[in-house]
């Protein structure tokens, strides 16, 4: 089960996660026992029932569940334990993975956990950001439940949850989260998530967005670049060609964030989430943090310009 095809991470990455997360898991478990006891332990250290699974097994089980969407019953049969043990294992390890945040390229040990952290990092390092929204299909709520229509996406005509993805110009994931119901438009999320406020606080940060964030580009024309509006039907051929070329260059510059979203969809729960809706945010952040670890290891390369350059100087 520890093979990368099952757990989605390399063996080196798995070893790093074991070293990083095992102390946090032990502290979390001991804190829970202390709260249940209402005080310090009464018996000697090591007394009481022993764990059926080591932390290595627990981490691998959680990674396999996140990567493949394998059911808890199937994992219980593979490890010869009960389904409740698997459920408790995932419930203990998944929050620790979700709390890790997002790795930063060329900055080992530094993690980003909020949109404010991302904008502060981009401002300090001069990083150009790319923003996009992502949708994940979720289960349909029961009939008669309040707010049932809030999750029906106008684009996909399905029950979805939307999130915001932020990457650099190489498609390396810097942030993914800020979940919202699928019916909410991207421009509405700009106001509710505080993205517009971050652009006001960091006027030197620039970003490339799609047409869903065109209102943000209108509010911050010097910072945000969105696809140009299509000319009217009676526009001349030259104007239409100029519009198509401008749209192509802008799309080419921001395609990297689409690649970051594609990396997320390689994990089964990000294609269709079948679990409880209140655990989606935790699952999403855990998966996105693991993807950012791998993306941060990609070396930084020079950002090529998409501007047109004349092949011959015609001014002479």
Regions inferred by a protein language model and the residue ranges of each:
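Charged, often Cys/His-bearing segments associated with DNA-binding zinc-finger transcription factors
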Residues: 1-53, 215, 299-308, 313-316
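Short helix-loop boundary/capping segments at the starts of domains
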Residues: 23-27, 67, 92-95, 99
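Residue-level marker of regulatory loop/turn positions in helix-turn-helix DNA-binding domains and
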Residues: 53-54, 249
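Short, amphipathic alpha-helical "recognition" segments used to contact nucleic acids or chromatin
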Residues: 54-69
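Short, well-ordered secondary-structure "scaffold" segments embedded in the functional core
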Residues: 74-98, 102-316
């Amino acid at each position: 089960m520890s093979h990368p095809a099952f757990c989605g991470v390399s063996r080196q990455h798995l070893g790093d996660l074991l070293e990083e997360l095992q102390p946090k898991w032990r502290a979390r478990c001991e804190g829970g026992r202390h709260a249940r006891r209402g005080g310090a332990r009464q018996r000697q250290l090591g007394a009481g029932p022993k764990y059926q699974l080591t932390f290595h097994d627990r981490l691998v089980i959680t990674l396999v569940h996140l990567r493949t969407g394998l059911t808890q019953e199937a994992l219980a049969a593979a490890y010869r334990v009960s389904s409740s043990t698997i459920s408790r294992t995932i419930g203990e390890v998944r929050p620790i993975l979700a709390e890790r945040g997002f790795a930063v390229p060329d900055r080992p040990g530094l993690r980003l956990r909020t949109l404010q952290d991302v904008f502060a990092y981009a401002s300090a390092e001069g990083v150009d950001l790319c923003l996009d929204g992502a949708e994940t299909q979720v289960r349909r709520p029961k009939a008669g439940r309040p707010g049932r229509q809030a999750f029906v996406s106008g684009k996909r005509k399905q029950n979805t949850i939307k999130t915001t993805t932020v990457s650099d110009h190489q498609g390396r994931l810097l942030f993914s989260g800020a979940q919202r119901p699928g019916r909410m438009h991207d421009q509405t999320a700009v106001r509710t998530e505080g993205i517009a406020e971050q652009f006001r606080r960091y006027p030197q940060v620039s970003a490339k967005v799609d047409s869903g964030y065109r209102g943000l580009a209108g509010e911050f024309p010097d910072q945000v670049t969105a696809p140009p509006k299509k000319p009217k039907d009676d526009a001349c051929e030259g104007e239409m060609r100029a519009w198509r070329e401008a749209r192509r260059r802008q799309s080419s510059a921001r395609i990297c964030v689409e690649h970051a979203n594609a990396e997320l969809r390689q994990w089964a729960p990000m294609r269709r989430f079948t679990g409880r809706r209140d655990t989606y945010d935790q699952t999403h952040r855990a998966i996105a943090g693991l993807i950012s670890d791998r993306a941060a290891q990609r070396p930084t390369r020079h950002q090529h310009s998409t501007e047109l350059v004349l092949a011959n100087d015609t001014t002479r």
